[in-house]
Swiss-Prot record:
It catalyses: a 2,3-saturated acyl-[ACP] + NAD(+) = a (2E)-enoyl-[ACP] + NADH + H(+). Its EC number is 1.3.1.9. One of its GO terms (biological process) is fatty acid biosynthetic process. This is Enoyl-[acyl-carrier-protein] reductase [NADH]. One of its GO terms (molecular function) is enoyl-[acyl-carrier-protein] reductase (NADH) activity.
Length: 405
């Protein structure tokens, strides 16, 4: 079929299989350009592997370190008459090109919060991956979590705490500057956000993997977080989501103590703001990202998801000098900070100066909103110059993926 983008709110309701594959190939090429190292992870599990930082982790592990990878995600496959989700096509493309490079690649499509997913992963590690993994990447960003056991469904809330938050934002449907107001989260919403986006599920995964004996000696685990700056703090770090990320930090410290007994460790990696399906849903973030992208590009500091993950692996988790990142690359909470360039004073001072100046009339001139829109469309396979969007494309793309029912 012929597929063009249809954007509604912060979601594009259509996806382009070939565009998604080209995105993945672009990330693979960026990774390969930095060389392949053999002193890093060999067997990698990525939980939340189909888009954003999770996908970039999988690409970096496979094509930057030659690792075998197992990816878990929850995506919708395409059919002959309907396109699937971008994450499905991303994962299909990864699988195709990993196998072409002689690397082991297997995927599980299902609820990554479920015990069934954990059981299937453990079975595959035992039967197909040599019995153990040495890196577990936890990269789930879901608005909903079904609790294992009870089946109770919890939902996260992108809300401030204590009082209504009003700020300048972009109406991304109309490309206009508006004042957005968000009501504060209730106590229940805060608690539920911690349950969905905090560290509980990460710990359940490590519990299950450790209990089954499939974590290698020296195994590491990393989960992703964002702290941001005072511009975004009310809605993020000081909001319900921030409480969940504090819980993630506490979990990391518990898991680190456990894994350290066997020569490994666990960290939260604090990453920079990038255009992902997750960040597009957070009010204020599109405007902030449009500003910070412009400033960081002008200073030669810009990084996308693949550049961030490449730096995380090569300069933090697996340093070439053999030293642990803890030597000089963590903050007081033992977090790996990859938001260091974004938080430079010169970058943030420029952002704060720009923020009050932006209007509907000068939005495209003062910020990189055009770049934001382009990156957003790319998430779904659109906006590429090397794809003919008026050409017919097959939407029923199959690959080596186990479907959990």
């Amino acid at each position: 079929m012929i597929i063009h983008p249809k954007v509604r709110g912060f979601i594009c309701t259509t996806t382009h299989p070939l565009g998604c594959e080209r995105n993945v190939l672009e990330q693979i090429a960026a990774t390969r350009a930095r060389g392949v190292r053999n002193d890093g992870p060999k067997k990698v599990l990525v939980i939340g592997a189909s888009s954003g930082y999770g996908l970039a982790s999988r690409i970096t592990a496979a094509f930057g370190f030659g690792a075998d990878t197992l990816g878990v995600f929850f995506e919708k496959p395409g059919t002959a008459s309907k396109a699937g989700t971008a994450g499905w096509y991303n994962s299909a493309a990864f699988d195709k090109h990993a196998k072409a490079a002689g690397l082991y690649s297997k995927s599980i499509n299902g609820d990554a919060f479920s015990d069934a997913a954990r059981a299937q992963v453990i079975e595959l590690i035992k039967t197909e991956m040599g019995g153990q993994v040495d890196l577990v990447v936890y990269s789930l960003a879901s608005p909903v979590r079904k609790l294992p056991g009870s089946g109770e469904v919890k939902r996260s809330a992108l809300k401030p705490i204590g009082q209504t938050y009003t700020a300048t934002a972009i109406d991304t449907n109309k490309d206009t500057i508006i004042q957005a107001s968000i009501e504060p989260a209730s106590a229940q919403e805060i608690e539920d956000t911690i349950t969905v986006m905090g560290g509980q599920d990460w710990e359940l995964w490590i519990d299950a993997l450790e209990g089954a004996g499939v974590l290698a000696d020296g195994a590491r685990s990393v989960a992703f977080s964002y702290i941001g700056t005072e511009i975004t703090w009310p809605i993020y770090w000081h909001g319900a989501l921030g409480k969940a990320k504090v819980d993630l930090d506490r979990t990391a410290q518990r898991l680190n103590a456990r894994l350290a007994k066997h020569g490994g460790g666990a960290n939260v990696a604090v990453l920079k703001s990038v255009v992902t399906q997750a960040s597009a849903a957070i009010p204020v973030m599109p405007l902030y990202i449009s500003m910070v992208y412009k400033i960081m590009k002008e200073k030669g500091l810009h990084e996308g998801t693949i550049e961030q993950l490449d730096r995380l692996f090569r300069e933090r988790l697996y340093r070439q000098d053999g030293q642990p990142a803890e030597v000089d690359e963590v903050d007081e909470q033992n977090r790996l900070r990859l938001d260091d360039w974004e938080l430079r004073d010169d970058v943030q001072d420029a952002c704060k100066a720009l923020w009050p100046q932006v209007t509907t009339e000068n939005l495209f001139e003062l910020t990189d909103y055009a770049g934001y829109k382009h990156e957003f469309l790319k998430l779904f396979g659109f906006g590429r110059t090397d794809v003919d969007y008026d050409a017919d494309v097959a939407t029923d793309v199959a690959f080596d993926c186990i479907e959990l029912v």
